[in-house]
A protein has these predicted regions:
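A domain-level signal for caspase-like cysteine endopeptidase catalytic cores
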Residues: 1-52, 72, 76-80, 113-115, ...
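Short loop/turn segments at strand-loop or loop-helix junctions that form parts
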Residues: 5-7, 48-64, 132-137
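Extracytoplasmic/secreted cell-surface and envelope-processing proteins
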Residues: 11-13, 58-63, 122-124, 140-142
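Short, glycine/charged-enriched secondary-structure capping and boundary segments
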Residues: 18, 63-67, 127-129
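Short, well-ordered alpha-helical microsegments
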Residues: 34-37, 57-59, 101, 120-124
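A short, glycine/acidic-enriched catalytic loop
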Residues: 56-108
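Active-site-proximal C-terminal subdomain of hydrolase catalytic domains
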Residues: 110-204
Length: 204
């Protein structure tokens, strides 16, 4: 499995999905700078692709943007942090996966899992098939954007359950078309999870 998961503190818990899977190749940060088009082209058609992070209907961001950056004064001496701060002020996300990559993704015959906000709309626009999330909360601030008031602790605990469940389903080679129903069943059996995330998956 090829895993496209740009490093971000808000989404790091999602590593639980693939942490114990065999034959997982996680894309290194340098590919996001160079562009992942060549990597997608070199990936065998039969290999599944898992995509996780922040994004919208246009594609996947390299990192969360337009938010509070946790930096110390010493970080301002680092050109990388200065560039990140500038990007945050501009409010323009750096998209690392977009419609240009749709052709290479379509080669994988629907064996794609996309977990980011509006991933399902991105898939529909680009005629992709697989398992995609519609809305997804990585933390309480994400939920607030959709009018839901909650706590980070609650979202993280709920997502950990979701990630473990999804990871087991993928490792067991459960068909993607059956996963939305199984995630919903898992949510119905647990009153302590955020049902919206569990119910946000659609198979296209």
């Amino acid at each position: 499995m090829l895993v496209i998961h740009p490093k971000d503190k808000s989404t790091s818990l999602a590593e639980t999905i693939y942490a114990n899977m065999p034959n997982v190749h996680v894309v290194e940060d340098e590919w996001y700078k160079r562009g992942i088009g060549q990597l997608l082209w070199q990936t065998p058609k039969e290999e599944p692709i898992l995509i996780i992070g922040y994004g919208d209907c246009r594609g996947l961001y390299r990192e969360r943007f337009n938010d509070v950056l946790e930096i110390s004064p010493s970080d301002l001496d680092n050109p990388v942090w200065v560039q990140r701060l500038a990007n945050c002020q501009i409010g323009t996300p750096q998209i690392v996966l977009n419609r240009i990559h749709a052709y290479n993704l379509r080669r994988h015959n629907g064996n794609i899992i996309g977990i980011w906000p509006n991933a399902v709309e991105f898939a529909r626009r680009n005629r992709l098939h697989g398992l995609f999330a519609s809305t997804f909360f990585f933390n309480a601030k994400d939920a607030e954007n959709y009018g839901e008031i909650t706590l980070d602790m609650y979202i993280e605990r709920s997502n950990y359950t979701l990630y473990r469940t999804l990871g087991k389903l993928l490792a067991s080679h459960v068909p993607l078309c059956k996963i939305p129903e199984k995630l919903q069943q898992r949510a119905y059996n647990d009153t302590c999870v955020n049902h919206r995330n569990f119910e946000s998956f659609f198979c296209l």
